[in-house]
């Protein structure tokens, strides 16, 4: 068994009963693959598939001019290098993007050519097409300096859908069937029945029209229409009646309207009897082919064909005419003997199309097309050309209508065609086929579609969304190019004169900047990042809206199994509309979600893994992952629990065709991080999954004692940790860098094998949390490829660590844990367990105003000395300064307009002879309630404006740092090269070299040591291989030096050039403050099971309840929070955490008493190898066992995977192992070892009952009291009501609302109430009067009329009611 570098240091004991058969796929694959397929950057133009950008270009080009003599053809596109890297874009507020250039060819044809078109001239050119944002390696985009995520959209798949209204439209509850053809791009075509069973169609939800108009418009005659939808009855007319061709099947269920007799005259079915199967058999046995029917049997029947007089050619009757006595008489007159009528009945062969045809008043194809034109363009006069153009453009023009490959596949599959490919536009056969199926549905045959089935909803990823947007931009360009192409020849234009890239840039910018699906990345912790990128939303353009989405769309559907998580979704109006991908889900080529299953053949479970989409899954019987399998891999139970077409059934093993790959395949990443999820109620599990995403990274992350085993995957895939790209030995580390000397077998020949990893230090995330990476390797450590070498935010030894392990006691304590409040020990705060660092970015801009330029300066009048002390000569705060609310960070003055001077100002100006008041102080100050340390300052200056000293100093420091970095890299690279060189040269025979070494001499290490290293290259080895290798290394070092010099020069150029700033901005300064937030009352905390609460009190350690050995609890929770919430998982977690800590203490004790290694190995084997997944501890050396043990002494981490976790017996065994009887007795444990006797810290007395105590992984959430609490002194008022504004951002007050008024009324506090509703609120004159009275020392309130009363009066007047206030 292979262990990675970090796994060896701390193995998580797994209780999984089932071996891992399929690894969790890379969690960000959906986003990265989608955008990669969109760009196809790594493919040469000739090998690019017709998708993404390539598809967008080929669908628009070639663009042909209106006269047809000039065209612009697309050849290929290329993406340039982005001008700035990701970090620089974030600092400067730029978009991380590549310039896109397309190679196009302008072809001009000879107008004079008499024969076929002759090319007159061709011009090829690369044209700039705007900038395309690039995706970072972690699946996000940097847009205007902030990281954003494009969320995938779950929308209704293109294709055809049949549904009914569930009886909601008509009062009788009759089902009204409808069908809808949804293209990927173009007009929607709807068919629907009305309550009278007439079939209508509508285009793009416009006015409805009879469907036969559409059928006529596609070229069908009434006869053809009836022939396609009905079977016919044949009649031969006689003078006194008729004979009907007998079809026995059509009689069943009918009531006989006359006696049916055989040839001998025997009555087989008597009149008015219902014909059953026996009657049909009797009639067939009698061999009857024709039946005589009375004349009234024909009346009311509908003719199927036009009837024409053979002699005169006159139409006697038209198709769809009803037979009447008159018509029959005319037919006999015309000597018509044979007629066909439509066969209809009330049960399963309705005459719907015939009735619709009767309503239709159009006569021919043109009239039908004109009717459609009038419906689409009311008020416009139809001409023949415009009518044809509109009709063909609706469904038959590839430029305006695109069903897409998915739509065609879904369409063909639904209407029962064998081929899944075809044209991307509709054909006449398609239109007809859909109507036929809809009529069949109305006749009671077939099933309607379930629109919430995941086979009918597909996912649009970043690549596809960006492609649609890019295509929209290209369409705008196409229009402009068409106009200009006509002048191309006359004006001798080049391709770049024709194409204006602005519409494309605007479309792309709008999509990435302000689309509903382009969201500000949730970067609170690594889990929130990864979840945001795996999110699928039903909202957004072309999707649903919150208001219109019903209950069914939001509900969990059987097809969600293994594709979309049934647990993780927001609470509130978006519930069920925003979902998360399940752990193993992926997208197929059509964009449908699919999930992996193991193939089962003849009840044997194979290792073959197939991905099935929701539609494919419906055809199979699939067993669950927890089905019992014997050693031979056979399903051993008599009956196996399985799923078939969404239903759970019990089947025999032989019928099973597939089996789940893992028990946790149903849930998403966040839900799979909850241990004992199977014991939690779904509502609370939802809260648990959502709240983990809000956990703030702690100062010192601590791994969860009870995890699920997926923590490592999440930490690595999120990109927060640093992984080794190649294996090797750690050569050098410091806080900001790790250097690895690559293994010889992984380094390429002649290349200098050194990898340098620069770590992210104290960087601000989107949510102002701190991103900081720390190395977890030491010099000399050997690491393999993909090993974790540095931890990031919220990770501990390469595992996700969102919170801290707290010793939790479930007991009430003086009401401080009433209603989910949390009582916390002071020790937790003192040890900085939940302290987090938040980085705030404060910025100020100096603009060019009408009155003159604003200036960033230290020279500000009326600024206190202690404030100035922190500013340098440029007026910018020093790094390292500790600042509090109101302190000046950047001094700035703004020119002020000339105003009337007061006498005092006139005096000052007379004395000092200067303008003392023409500028006002607009400095950047620390906002209220913030205390922190300045950790970084960035100064950006527009091109052409001289830099101040601070800006220059920042650039010089950055360049110096970069040069040191490069020098270090060069030193390491050269050191590595010379080391390899020495290894190669020692012992080799030379032809000559420095220090007059004789030919044929062997090189020794001493000889090399005496030489200057650069003279080694002058040695001439006798064998060619060594000589070539020597030359290669020499060139490699020279090349590296050259690269480093170029890199430095490029960096210098970037730093010294002016910065891109918004219009009118001369200079911008950004100051970064690090704020340390300790845990305090009012902060929100939560476990992983939805057990959330607010810290009510931080209690001195001596008052906390403690155990017999004096260990105090860290957290006291209310036991009443468990039963009604039904999240028992937290109790099981506490028990297992208690065992984990106890085992750690025992290992620590063994290390302290220095027991034999063999005994330590035996104890570790008892923990790891007696149940669940076993570990290969024998492969560990003694040193590795000791290192493992020392990492376990704070607790042995457990993994209890979702739906496959530890059972009661295993928890009990671990508790017995952790707390032998003598320890259990000392601690006053119960026999089960689940509860402990606790003592009151204040009195020292034992509590009456034993208490459940153990370790729970507890999180501090991003809802911190510091961000929410503020106090208002004097602040802004609302313009209309003159009441104080609300909210922290507006420096507002608390609203004294209706219920608060009741409270004061109840107390009879009339004067308090009066001042609350008047002078403290919106009585403008009263407010001023109170201030005047206070200044005079007269403490009297003169309450006047509140402004809100005047507003009320005005509103009543606006209703037209004259209302006036009568004053006494």
UniProtKB/Swiss-Prot annotation:
The catalysed reaction is: RNA(n) + a ribonucleoside 5'-triphosphate = RNA(n+1) + diphosphate
User: One of this protein's GO BP terms?
Assistant: DNA-templated transcription
* Any single Pfam family the record assigns to this protein: RNA_pol_Rpb2_3
Taxonomically, the superkingdom here is: Bacteria
Q: Which Gene3D superfamilies match?
A: 2.40.50.100, 2.40.50.150, 3.90.1100.10, DNA-directed RNA polymerase, beta subunit, external 1 domain, DNA-directed RNA polymerase, subunit 2, domain 6, RNA polymerase alpha subunit dimerisation domain, RNA polymerase Rpb2, domain 2
Q: Where are the transmembrane segments?
A: none
Q: Does the keyword Zinc apply?
A: no
Q: Name one GO molecular function term.
A: ribonucleoside binding
Q: How does it assemble?
A: The RNAP catalytic core consists of 2 alpha, 1 beta, 1 beta' and 1 omega subunit. When a sigma factor is associated with the core the holoenzyme is formed, which can initiate transcription.
- Its family? Belongs to the RNA polymerase beta chain family.
NCBIfam families registered for this protein in UniProt: PRK00405.1, rpoB
User: What is the designated name of this protein?
Assistant: DNA-directed RNA polymerase subunit beta
Q: What is the lineage of its organism?
A: Bacteria, Pseudomonadati, Pseudomonadota, Betaproteobacteria, Burkholderiales
């Amino acid at each position: 068994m292979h262990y990675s570098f970090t796994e060896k240091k701390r193995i998580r004991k797994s209780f999984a009963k089932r071996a891992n058969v399929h690894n969790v796929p890379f969690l960000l694959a959906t986003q990265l693959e989608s955008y990669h397929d969109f760009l196809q950057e790594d493919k040469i133009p000739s090998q690019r598939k017709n998708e993404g950008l390539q598809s967008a270009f080929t669908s628009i080009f070639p663009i042909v001019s209106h006269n047809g003599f000039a065209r612009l053809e697309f050849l290929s596109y290329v993406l340039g290098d982005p001008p700035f890297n990701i970090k620089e874009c974030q600092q400067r507020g730029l978009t991380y993007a590549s310039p896109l250039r397309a190679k196009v060819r302008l072809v001009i044809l000879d107008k004079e050519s008499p024969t076929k078109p002759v090319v007159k001239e061709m011009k090829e050119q690369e044209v700039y097409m705007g900038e395309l944002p690039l995706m970072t390696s972690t699946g996000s985009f940097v847009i205007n300096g902030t990281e954003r995520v494009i969320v995938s959209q779950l929308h209704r798949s293109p294709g055809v859908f049949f549904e009914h209204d569930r009886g909601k439209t008509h009062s009788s509850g009759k089902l009204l069937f409808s069908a809808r053809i949804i293209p990927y791009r173009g007009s929607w075509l709807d068919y629907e029945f009305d309550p009278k069973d007439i079939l209508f169609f509508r285009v793009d939800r416009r006015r409805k029209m009879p469907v036969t108009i559409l059928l006529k418009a596609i070229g069908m005659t009434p006869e053809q229409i009836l022939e396609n939808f009905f079977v016919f009855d044949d009649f031969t007319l006689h003078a006194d009646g008729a004979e009907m061709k007998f079809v026995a099947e059509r009689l069943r269920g009918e009531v006989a309207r006359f006696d049916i007799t055989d040839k001998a005259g025997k009555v087989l079915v008597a009149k008015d009897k219902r014909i059953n199967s026996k009657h049909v058999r009797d009639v067939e046995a009698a061999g009857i082919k024709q039946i005589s029917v009375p004349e009234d049997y024909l009346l009311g029947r509908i003719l199927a064909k036009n009837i024409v007089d053979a002699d005169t050619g006159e139409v006697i009757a038209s198709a769809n005419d009803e037979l009447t006595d008159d018509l029959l008489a005319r037919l006999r007159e015309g000597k018509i003997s044979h007629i066909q009528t439509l066969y209809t009945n009330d049960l399963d062969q309705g005459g719907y199309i015939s009735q619709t045809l009767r309503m239709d008043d159009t006569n021919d194809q043109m009239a039908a097309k004109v009717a459609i034109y009038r419906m689409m363009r009311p008020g416009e006069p139809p001409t023949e050309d415009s009518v044809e153009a509109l009709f063909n453009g609706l469904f038959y023009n590839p430029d305006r209508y695109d069903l897409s490959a998915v739509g065609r596949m879904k369409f063909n599959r639904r209407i029962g065609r064998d081929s899944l490919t075809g044209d991307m536009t509709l054909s006449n056969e398609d239109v007809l086929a859909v109507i036929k199926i809809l009529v069949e549905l109305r006749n009671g045959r077939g099933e309607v579609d379930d629109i919430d089935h995941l086979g009918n909803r597909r996912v649009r990823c970043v690549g596809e969304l960006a492609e649609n947007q890019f295509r929209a931009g290209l369409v705008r360009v196409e229009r402009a190019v068409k106009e200009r192409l006509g002048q191309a020849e006359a004006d001798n234009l080049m391709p770049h004169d024709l194409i204006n890239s602005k519409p494309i840039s605007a479309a792309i910018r709008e999509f990435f900047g302000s689309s509903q699906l382009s969201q500000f990345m949730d970067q609170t912790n690594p889990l929130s990042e990864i979840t945001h990128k795996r999110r699928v939303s039903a909202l957004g353009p072309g999707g649903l809206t919150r208001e219109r989405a019903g209950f069914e769309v939001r509900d969990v559907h059987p097809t969600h199994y293994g594709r979309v998580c049934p647990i993780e979704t927001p609470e509130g109006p978006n519930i069920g509309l925003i979902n998360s991908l399940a752990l193993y889900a992926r997208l197929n080529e059509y964009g449908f979600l699919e999930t992996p299953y193991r193939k089962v053949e003849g009840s044997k479970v194979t290792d073959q893994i197939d991905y099935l989409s929701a539609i494919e899954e419906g055809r199979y019987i699939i067993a669950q992952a927890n089905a019992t399998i014997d050693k031979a891999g056979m399903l051993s139970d008599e009956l196996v629990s399985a799923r078939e077409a969404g239903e759970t059934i019990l089947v025999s093993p032989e019928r099973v065709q597939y089996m789940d790959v893992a028990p946790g395949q149903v849930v998403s990443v966040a839900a799979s991080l909850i241990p004992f999820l199977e014991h939690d109620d779904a509502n609370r599990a939802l809260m648990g999954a959502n709240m983990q995403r809000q956990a703030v990274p702690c100062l010192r992350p601590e791994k969860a004692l009870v995890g699920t085993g997926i923590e490592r995957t999440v930490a690595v895939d999120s990109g927060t940790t640093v992984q080794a790209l190649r294996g090797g030995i750690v050569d050098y580390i410091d806080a900001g860098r790790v250097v690895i000397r690559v293994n010889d077998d992984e380094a390429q020949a002649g290349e200098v094998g050194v990898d340098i990893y620069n770590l992210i230090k104290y960087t601000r995330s989107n949510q102002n949390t701190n991103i900081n990476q720390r190395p977890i390797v030491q010099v000399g450590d050997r690491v393999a490829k993909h090993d974790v070498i540095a931890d990031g935010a919220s990770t501990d030894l390469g595992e996700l660590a969102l919170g801290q392990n707290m010793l939790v006691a479930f007991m009430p304590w003086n009401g401080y844990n009433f209603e989910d409040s949390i009582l916390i020990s002071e020790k937790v705060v003192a040890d900085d367990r939940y302290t987090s660092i938040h980085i705030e970015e404060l910025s100020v801009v100096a603009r060019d105003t009408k009155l003159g330029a604003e200036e960033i300066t230290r020279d500000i009048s009326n600024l206190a000395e202690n404030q100035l002390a922190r500013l340098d000569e440029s007026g910018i705060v020093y790094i390292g300064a500790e600042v509090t609310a109101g302190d000046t960070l950047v001094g700035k003055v703004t020119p002020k307009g000339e105003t009337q001077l007061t006498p005092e100002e006139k005096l000052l100006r007379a004395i000092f002879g200067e303008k003392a008041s023409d500028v006002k102080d607009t400095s950047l100050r620390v906002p209220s309630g913030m205390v922190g340390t300045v950790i970084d300052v960035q100064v950006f200056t527009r091109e052409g404006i001289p830099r101040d000293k601070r800006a220059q100093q920042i650039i010089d420091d950055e360049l110096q740092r970069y040069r040191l970095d490069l020098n270090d890299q060069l030193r390491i690279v050269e050191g590595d090269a010379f080391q390899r060189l020495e290894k190669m040269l020692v012992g080799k025979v030379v032809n000559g070299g420095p220090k007059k070494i004789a030919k044929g001499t062997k090189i020794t290490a001493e000889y090399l040591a005496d030489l200057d290293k650069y003279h080694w290259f002058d040695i001439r080895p006798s064998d060619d291989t060594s000589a070539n290798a020597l030359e290669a290394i020499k060139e490699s070092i020279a090349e590296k030096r050259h690269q480093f010099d170029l890199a430095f020069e490029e960096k210098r150029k970037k730093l010294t050039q002016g910065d891109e700033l918004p219009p009118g901005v001369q200079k911008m300064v950004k100051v970064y403050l690090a704020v340390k937030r300790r845990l305090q009352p009012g902060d929100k905390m939560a476990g992983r099971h939805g057990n959330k609460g607010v810290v009510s009190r931080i209690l001195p350690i001596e008052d906390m309840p403690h155990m017999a050995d004096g260990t105090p609890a860290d957290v006291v929770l209310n036991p009443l929070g468990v039963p009604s919430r039904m999240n028992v998982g937290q109790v099981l977690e506490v028990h297992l955490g208690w065992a984990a800590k106890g085992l750690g203490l025992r290992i620590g004790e063994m290390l302290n008493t220095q027991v034999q290694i063999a005994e330590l190995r035996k104890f570790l084997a008892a923990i790891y190898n007696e149940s669940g997944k076993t570990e290969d501890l024998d492969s560990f050396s003694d040193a590795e066992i000791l290192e493992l043990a020392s990492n376990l002494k704070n607790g042995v981490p457990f993994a209890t995977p979702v739906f496959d976790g530890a059972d009661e017996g295993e928890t009990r065994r671990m508790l017995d192992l952790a707390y032998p009887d003598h320890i259990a007795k000392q601690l006053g444990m119960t026999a089960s070892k689940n509860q402990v006797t606790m003592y009151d810290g204040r009195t020292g007395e034992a509590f009456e009952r034993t208490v459940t105590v153990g370790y729970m992984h507890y999180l501090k959430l991003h809802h911190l009291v510091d961000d929410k609490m503020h106090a208002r002194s004097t602040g802004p008022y609302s313009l209309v009501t003159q009441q104080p504004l609300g909210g922290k951002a507006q420096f507002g007050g608390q609203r004294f609302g209706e219920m608060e008024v009741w409270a004061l009324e109840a107390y009879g506090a009339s004067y308090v109430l009066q001042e609350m509703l008047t002078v403290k609120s919106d009585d403008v004159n009263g407010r001023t009067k109170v201030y005047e009275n206070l200044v005079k020392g007269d403490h009297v309130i003169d309450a006047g009329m509140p402004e809100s009363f005047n507003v009320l009066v005005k509103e009543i007047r606006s209703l037209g009611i004259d209302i006036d206030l009568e004053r006494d």
